[in-house]
């Protein structure tokens, strides 16, 4: 997988190819959002669940701040995606110092949220899910939910702040072409 990103960088992100040839050249493991931005790709390894197996993260760095595109673990000797989502546009994730993964998503201007996960083996286990929804007739009227139950705006942001207070997981980023 790392080799696919490196090959794309080494070949000018396949910019000289037609659309179909370009899609084939990238390969199925290269994040669609990364293909568009054409910035250097980096990877980091970190054992999130303490089982002795490092998870692989792929991203870019903007002023030293990562934008993540993929996270994988190992199952049966194969690299497996922990999430089905394509990251980098409406869905993104951050990694906290305690190993919690926060997935930030938006399905529309009227619905968005945060899902918090822990890695367990080759799976991402949902800890908590929060979302906010706007009334289609009154965009200023927001409703807040945690795990399906309505909560106050204060509770919604307090939970998110409690995770943010943990700070980011320090990661050692390496350019895929190194």
Describe the residue ranges of each PLM region.
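Blade-edge motifs of beta-propeller repeat domains
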Residues: 1-37, 78-89
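Acidic, small-residue rich beta-repeat scaffolds with periodic aromatic anchors
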Residues: 1-9, 98-178
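Beta-propeller blade termini
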Residues: 39-48, 90-100
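Repetitive beta-architecture junctions, highlighting loop-to-beta-strand starts
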Residues: 41, 67-69, 112
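A short, structured loop/turn motif at beta-sheet edges
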Residues: 47-51, 73-78, 94-95, 119-124
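Acidic/hydrophobic-patterned starts of short beta strands in beta-sheet-rich repeat architectures
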Residues: 49-60, 97-104
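Short glycine/acidic-enriched loop and turn motifs that connect beta-strands
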Residues: 61-65, 107-110
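Extracellular C-terminal loop/segment signatures of secreted glycoproteins
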Residues: 65-94
